[in-house]
From Swiss-Prot:
GO cellular component: ATAC complex; cytosol; molybdopterin synthase complex; polytene chromosome
Protein name: Molybdopterin synthase catalytic subunit
InterPro entries membership: MoaE_sf, MOCS2B_euk, Mopterin_biosynth_MoaE
Catalysed reaction equations from the record: 2 [molybdopterin-synthase sulfur-carrier protein]-C-terminal-Gly-aminoethanethioate + cyclic pyranopterin phosphate + H2O = molybdopterin + 2 [molybdopterin-synthase sulfur-carrier protein]-C-terminal Gly-Gly + 2 H(+)
Source organism: Drosophila willistoni
Alphabetical keyword list: Cytoplasm, Molybdenum cofactor biosynthesis, Transferase
Subunit structure: Heterotetramer; composed of 2 small (Mocs2A) and 2 large (Mocs2B) subunits.
Principal localisation: cytoplasm
Length: 372
């Protein structure tokens, strides 16, 4: 059994020792911590203990659990700690265990003392005789980080040197010419206005009753609240509760189906350039060079006595430029088919939509067929 307590009265060691009694135990180990009369040449009058009691009790119970996990044969565990003023010679802490064998009792008490000083949030202040001021004692065995370690990791702003700013700054580089107060005021106004816009949109999108007069008139009622009256309202022709708008581009190569005569009109405009690109008069011995000259003349490029690879690179750059800047380049890249040679588009199959009752009937018929 575990006996744990924080008390303000003196500790009675004899009474606590009776808590260890058990017929099956052959050994008991007791540790008693008392107040000594001196510390580093100073005469100590008393010690004062303070604790964060809920957390201290929790940690003491955890210590008991750890002891029983390591020594399962422990019968009783006693951890009593005194709070308040403890004069010289009186006990401040009692830790005791009982077990069938002495080794478990001795080792468990030693570990419990170390864990108590390391984990339990109990603080001690020493009161000295004379003019020496009282001093809170730092527990060097505590697992918690020391104040010096925390402060040492902080950033030292003194190491950052601020260079003198150049006063000869051009006015063109300064975008805001107001004081800090005016700038803060503008930022606050901007945030307030955006907050009002968001609140109004929330009322429009999430209000529970769209027919309310204050909603239709963009006015805020005294008893309305978007958080409490909000509801998910599915918009028409949309899979979500927010409004979705579809934009159709009425011009460009991707919208040619909206202009049936677009290809014919573009062919008429390009007819003159196509007829002028006749490579019959530019026959050369090198077939690759001949074909490249045809492409260059068609695209309006000049060879300028460059190498074959350089001319190919020039043609590629020209194609990339046309693709990025001219929508009508779709006439060159896409092989448009005549209306007579267009293949019929495959018909979309309409799938029948079954209701829940029809599905149940189908499943029932399948079960009957398999069962028969």
């Amino acid at each position: 059994m575990d006996h744990i307590e924080l008390i303000s009265s003196p500790l009675d060691i004899t009474t606590l020792y009776t808590l260890l009694g058990d017929p099956g135990c052959g050994a008991s180990s007791v540790f008693v911590g008392t107040t000594r009369d001196s510390f580093e040449g100073k005469k100590v009058l008393s010690l004062e203990y303070e604790a964060y009691e809920p957390m201290a009790i929790k940690e003491m119970k955890t210590i008991c659990t750890d002891l029983r996990a390591k020594w399962p044969d422990l019968k009783h565990i006693v951890i009593y700690h005194r709070l308040g003023s403890v004069p010289v010679g009186e006990a401040s802490v009692v830790i005791a265990t009982s077990a069938p064998h002495r080794l478990s009792a001795l080792e468990s008490v030693s570990l419990a003392v170390d864990q108590l000083k390391t984990r339990v949030p109990i603080w001690k202040k020493e009161l000295y005789e004379g003019d020496d001021p009282a001093q809170w004692k730092e527990n060097k065995e505590s697992l918690r980080p020391k104040h010096s370690q925390v402060t040492s990791n902080r950033f030292n702003f003194a190491t950052c040197k601020i260079e003198k700013q150049n006063e000869n700054i051009s006015d063109k580089l300064v975008q805001i010419r107001v004081h800090d107060d005016e700038l803060s005021k503008r930022v606050e106004c901007f945030v307030r206005r955006k907050r009002m816009e968001i609140n109004m949109l929330n009322v429009r999108d999430f209000t529970q009753n769209q027919s309310l007069p204050h909603v239709l008139n963009n006015e805020e009622a005294e008893v309305s609240c978007a958080r409490t009256q909000g509801a998910v309202i599915k918009q028409e022709q949309s899979n979500c509760h927010l409004k979705v708008r579809r934009v159709n581009n009425k011009s460009g190569p991707q919208q040619m189906h909206l202009r049936p005569n677009y290809a014919q009109e573009l062919n008429k405009l390009m007819g003159s350039s196509e007829s002028s690109c006749d490579p019959s008069g530019q026959v050369q011995n090198d077939l690759a060079n001949n074909r490249l000259r045809t492409i260059e003349s068609y695209m309006g490029l000049s060879a300028n006595n460059q190498s074959l690879l350089s001319r190919l690179k020039q043609v590629e750059n020209r194609i990339l430029l046309l693709e990025s800047t001219s929508p009508e380049y779709n006439h060159f890249t896409n092989n448009l088919k005549q209306p007579d040679s267009e293949e019929p588009s495959p018909k979309r199959l309409k799938r029948k939509i079954y209701c829940a009752e029809e599905l149940n009937n189908l499943l029932k018929s399948f079960k009957d067929e398999t069962g028969s």
